[in-house]
């Protein structure tokens, strides 16, 4: 495996001078697409492993916690979203990773034990379009020092506090302007339909995509994947806008205290990196096919954000035919001077903001696509998880994970198929059937980078604090990483 050092100065030109970290690629683990987790079951709709929708790292137990999304089938299968605990070996000198070990699986559930479901709300028993019920599309995760989780849901969008066992504890209050509503009298809430019917709030399948906590756990920050339906000009319903929102929550009350603007990279700049013009992103792709996948606090008022397009290795793209990738990037942002836009509709321009509004500042931290191209690696579609790992001898580890969509696609009749690729053209087989010879399911990919250099100082020392042994031992036991669960762990070596 090739390892090399990337200066963020040389990654690509950002809107402003990029950050000055020294970033070294540490390698990749491909977790097989047919791997299973530790939940009961015997088919892909029950326990196929997928953990790359977001992840967080616990320094005390050296454990990563990654979450699934709503499951295979895109909201048409009763899959129980969950959190997966796993460990990897990380070389203290290079940051190279190896030996993926799944140690526990916890399904998100109500206090009575009823699991949350990836089904659209109106597909739940007795469900309607107007209430979420037990519907959950988990896309972001943060973790408190006591082992509890904050989960960002895309359906609402919602933020839920879960116990370390995955039990629902309480919901935060979603700002009213983010809730999807119809334009009819009364502005009925509608969590299911698209922009043909819903005219304000989050776009369909574009709710909260990431969540993070500040250093003392008093504030949470949830980020939208794309602009709101009303945040833009004309009839495109946000799809031509670059302006999406970050919401600051007070953890104690669960109330939103601020909304800030994050500006996506303009598609013109992205198109300039794509050969020719045949594969350029059109106007309606700006705020729909280009978006944000993750947010991670790194210290003070600074965060890392993954921004990406919808191209690259993934089940649907493999079947349709891969197109040139334009954007897989990590930006360092600072919210210190960002204006509160809680009461502001951003409908005067798709790009420019009113003079009274200052967005979060933004510097390029890492061009993921360029780094992987230099390393001779494939570029997956969905980079959705970022975690600050352990300290190394010189710097620290940063890990990324991809969402492989369970290696599943579906047709217009909502019939699911496994996508197999490898030798020859990609093929589809019945869900759960073996792949043809020479082909495999799309894996979840886990990447490591070593971060060092002057700007590593932007990362708070609290990110690397290790609790007293007695404290974290209790948390590990509470999550089920000892005893029977440890004896059942799965080891995947790459």
Label each PLM-derived region with a short phrase:
Residues 489-494:
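Short, charged juxtamembrane terminal tails flanking transmembrane helices
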Residues 7, 18, 63, 475-480:
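Hydrophobic alpha-helical segments
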Residues 1-20:
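Gram-negative bacterial Sec-dependent N-terminal signal peptides
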């Amino acid at each position: 495996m090739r390892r090399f050092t990337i200066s963020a100065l040389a990654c690509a030109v950002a809107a402003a001078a990029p950050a000055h970290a020294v970033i070294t690629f540490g390698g990749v683990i491909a977790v097989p697409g047919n791997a299973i987790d530790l939940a009961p079951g015997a088919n892909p709709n029950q326990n196929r492993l997928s953990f790359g929708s977001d992840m967080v790292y616990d320094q005390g137990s050296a454990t990563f916690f990654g979450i699934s999304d709503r499951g295979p089938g895109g909201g048409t299968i009763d899959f129980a979203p969950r959190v997966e605990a796993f460990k990897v070996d990380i070389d203290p000198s290079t940051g190279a990773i190896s030996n993926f070990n799944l140690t526990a699986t916890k399904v998100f559930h109500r206090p009575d034990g009823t699991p949350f479901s990836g089904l659209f709300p109106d597909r739940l028993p007795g469900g309607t379009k107007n209430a979420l019920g037990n519907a959950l599309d988990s896309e972001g995760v943060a973790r408190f020092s006591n082992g509890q989780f904050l989960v960002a849901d895309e359906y609402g969008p919602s933020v839920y506090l879960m116990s370390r066992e995955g039990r629902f504890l309480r919901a935060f209050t979603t700002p009213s302007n983010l809730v999807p509503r119809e334009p009819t009298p009364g502005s009925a809430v509608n969590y299911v339909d698209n922009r043909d019917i819903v005219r304000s709030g989050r776009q369909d399948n574009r709710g909260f995509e990431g969540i993070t906590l500040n250093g003392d756990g008093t504030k949470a920050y949830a980020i939208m994947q794309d602009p709101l339906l009303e945040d833009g000009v004309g009839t495109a319903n946000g799809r031509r806008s670059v302006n999406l929102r970050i919401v600051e929550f007070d953890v104690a009350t669960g109330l939103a205290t601020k909304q800030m603007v994050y500006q996506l990279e303009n598609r013109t700049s992205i198109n300039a990196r794509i050969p020719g013009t045949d594969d350029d992103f059109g106007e309606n792709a700006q705020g729909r096919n280009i978006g944000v996948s993750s947010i991670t606090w790194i210290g003070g008022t600074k965060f890392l954000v993954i921004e990406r397009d919808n191209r690259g290795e993934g089940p649907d793209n493999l079947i349709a035919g891969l197109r040139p990738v334009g954007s897989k990037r990590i930006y360092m942002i600072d919210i210190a001077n960002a204006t509160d836009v809680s009461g502001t509709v951003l409908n005067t321009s798709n790009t420019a903001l009113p003079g009274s509004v200052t967005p979060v500042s933004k510097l390029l931290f890492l061009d993921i696509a360029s780094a992987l191209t230099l390393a001779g690696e494939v570029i997956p579609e969905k980079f959705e998880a970022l975690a600050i790992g352990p300290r190394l001898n010189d710097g620290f580890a940063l890990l990324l994970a991809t969402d492989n969509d369970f290696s599943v696609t579906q047709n217009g009749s909502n019939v699911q198929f496994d996508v197999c690729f490898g030798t020859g053209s990609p093929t589809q087989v019945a869900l759960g059937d073996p792949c043809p010879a020479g082909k495999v399911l799309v894996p979840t990919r886990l990447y490591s980078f070593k971060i060092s250099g002057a700007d590593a100082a932007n990362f708070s020392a609290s990110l690397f604090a290790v609790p007293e042994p007695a404290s974290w031992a209790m948390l590990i036991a509470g999550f089920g990483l000892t005893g029977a669960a440890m004896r059942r762990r799965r080891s995947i070596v790459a």
